[in-house]
């Protein structure tokens, strides 16, 4: 049947299931650990679905990202505005017409878009949604650390073939909330009586990374930073104030968040949210801080998509964003990964520095056709973000050199090819590492991560008015590195320079300048006879465990201040 026939009587064909296709045939629909089905949803219950509309001129967008992010380019630092991006990638008039006509025929109501017009979120009843998306069958689920309730479909959905050139995917059907890169470890035993610290605090971080009491924001520049929270994770201002009273006495700081974008609940504070806010604001001290709160409170919402749409709907944004969440690449559809990667590319074009935690499963492990392979995570594997790994002190209670934190995520993407900016560094690692795992375990030609690292082991956090020790994970290292980049942006802005923007092209050109090289330790992987639980190992220069290393702030400031 030809396209013209599919266009005729479009809604009737939806109902009959003819001329249809699956946008996400590879989307995993198995139930994640810790989630339980509560049965079919009421047909009259409402949910929201997000339709990702096909964008234009993505090759040109990629070229512009390279131009504004490469210090050797005459376009370096000349970032696009949101309006520039919208004009470039906005869906075609035909796409907008086709999708809106289809939704109107299905009875979708209360639809709203974003400035770029490439996401459309609509409210429908379960009955309408199942008619609109043949094959979908909505169920209630509960799970996650906060017993979150969601509505998802365990079955694949179909779209009319006529929409294939116009819709990338529909959000709110399959993907469960992303997982956090956060762990709480048992308190280590102190041997002997001399210890310089009993856990990582802002003063420990500032001493290790060579910050002085003067390394704080001015409080007057047009500089800001942000972190994103999901899974109904909330912070409390009272916890932040107590944290600063306990640990912020030797540097100027702000004791409250400047702005919350989204919904900030009034329930118990989450350790994840508390950690992110407290260490972003103590590392990036005295800098205006936003919190993006995308709880996914309504059962049909995907919180990560909510966050991306918030970025696409505001012209003036913080310069640095840190995110401590992710999923295994293989758990997500190709359509979803590619579209999210495009959204991250759009952020890079606008001069945003996006930092993602590398994860807390080492190289990861899963079985493919009966054989173990390492398991990369996304968005850590995106070529348009700076990914942060984790380290530990070589001597647990001394502020010493750092070694690999064995849970620090890292590896090679199975989706994205190696970007040109890291070609030299990764090729050198692959040719010189004495402890390389067998080639069948990883995709040596993929985007390699992390790019940098910071301490990730043994943090103190205040949550619900209680100081909590030994919180660990790349959820800790990511806001720390982000805060230090915000301090560098402060110097750049005050001297009339643009903010750093997408950091990786510059980072790899500078070959680790301004960073402490971490050369000892390996991270975890598959527990089998061939690799015996060992993934990749660190070494001189870049490696897929700690990237280029951890920040030496005065040297990193000098390296990144010019041009």
From Swiss-Prot:
Cofactors = Ca(2+)
Which sites are catalytic?
Answer: 272, 276, 475
Q: Name one Pfam family in it.
A: Pro-kuma_activ
Q: Summarize the PTM comment.
A: Activated by autocatalytic proteolytical processing upon acidification. N-glycosylation is required for processing and activity.
Q: What is its main location?
A: other
Q: Which reaction does it catalyse?
A: Release of an N-terminal tripeptide from a polypeptide, but also has endopeptidase activity
Disulphide bridges, residue numbers = 111-122, 365-526, 522-537
Propeptide residue interval(s): 20-195
Q: Which SUPFAM superfamilies match?
A: Protease propeptides/inhibitors, Subtilisin-like
List the CDD domains hit by this protein, alphabetically.
Peptidases_S53, Pro-peptidase_S53
Entry function = Lysosomal serine protease with tripeptidyl-peptidase I activity. May act as a non-specific lysosomal peptidase which generates tripeptides from the breakdown products produced by lysosomal proteinases. Requires substrates with an unsubstituted N-terminus.
Name of the protein described by the UniProt record:
Tripeptidyl-peptidase 1
Whichever gene encodes this chain, its name is TPP1
């Amino acid at each position: 049947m030809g396209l013209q026939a599919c266009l005729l009587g479009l809604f009737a064909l939806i109902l009959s299931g003819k001329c249809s296709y699956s946008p996400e045939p590879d989307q995993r629909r198995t139930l994640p650990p810790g989630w339980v089905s509560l049965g079919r949803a009421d047909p009259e219950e409402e949910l929201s679905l997000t339709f990702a509309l096909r964008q234009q001129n993505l090759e040109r967008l990629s070229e512009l990202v390279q131009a504004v992010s490469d210090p050797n380019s005459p376009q370096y630092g000349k970032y696009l505005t949101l309006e520039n991006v919208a004009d470039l990638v906005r869906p075609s008039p035909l796409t907008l017409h086709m999708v809106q006509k289809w939704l109107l025929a299905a009875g979708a109501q209360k639809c709203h878009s974003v400035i770029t017009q490439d996401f459309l979120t609509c409210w429908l009843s379960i009955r309408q949604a199942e008619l609109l998306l043949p094959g979908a069958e909505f169920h209630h689920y509960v799970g996650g650390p906060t017993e979150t309730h969601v509505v998802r479909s365990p079955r694949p959905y179909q779209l009319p073939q006529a929409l294939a050139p116009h819709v990338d995917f529909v959000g709110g059907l399959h993907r469960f909330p992303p997982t956090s890169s956060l762990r709480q470890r048992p308190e280590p035993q102190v041997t002997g009586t001399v210890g310089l610290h009993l856990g990582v605090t802002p003063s420990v971080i500032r001493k290790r990374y060579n910050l002085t009491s003067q390394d704080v924001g001015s409080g007057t520049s047009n500089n800001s930073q942000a972190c994103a929270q999901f899974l109904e994770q909330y912070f409390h201002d009272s916890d932040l104030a107590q944290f600063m009273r306990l640990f912020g006495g030797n540097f100027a700081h702000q004791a409250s968040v400047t702005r919350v974008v989204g919904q900030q609940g009034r329930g118990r504070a989450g350790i994840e949210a508390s950690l992110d806010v407290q260490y972003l604001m103590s590392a990036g001290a005295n800098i205006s801080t936003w919190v993006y709160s995308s709880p996914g409170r309504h059962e049909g919402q995907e919180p990560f998509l909510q966050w991306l749409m918030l970025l696409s709907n505001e012209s003036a944004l913080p310069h640095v964003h840190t995110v401590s969440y992710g999923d295994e690449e293989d758990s997500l559809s190709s359509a979803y990964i590619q579209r999210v990667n495009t959204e991250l590319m759009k952020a890079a074009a606008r001069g945003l520095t996006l930092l993602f935690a590398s994860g807390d499963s080492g190289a990861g492990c899963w079985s493919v056709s009966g054989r173990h392979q390492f398991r990369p995570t996304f968005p850590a594997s995106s070529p348009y973000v700076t990914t942060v790994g984790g380290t530990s002190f070589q001597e647990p209670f001394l502020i010493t050199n750092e070694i690999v934190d064995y849970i620090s995520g890292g590896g090679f993407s199975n989706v994205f090819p190696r970007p040109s900016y890291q070609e030299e560094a990764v090729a050198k690692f692959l040719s010189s590492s004495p402890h390389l795992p067998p080639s069948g375990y990883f995709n040596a030609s993929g985007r390699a991560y992390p790019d940098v690292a910071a301490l990730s082991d043994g943090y103190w956090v205040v949550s619900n008015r209680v100081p909590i020790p030994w919180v660990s994970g790349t959820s800790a290292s990511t806001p720390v590195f982000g805060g230090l980049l915000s301090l560098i942006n402060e110097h750049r802005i005050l001297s009339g320079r643009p903010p750093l923007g997408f950091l990786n092209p510059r980072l790899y050109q500078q070959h680790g300048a301004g960073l402490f090289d971490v050369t000892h330790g390996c991270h975890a992987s598959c527990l089998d006879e061939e690799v015996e639980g060992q993934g990749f190992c660190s070494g001189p220069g870049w490696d897929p465990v700690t990237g280029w290393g951890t920040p030496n702030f005065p040297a990193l400031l000098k390296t990144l201040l010019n041009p």
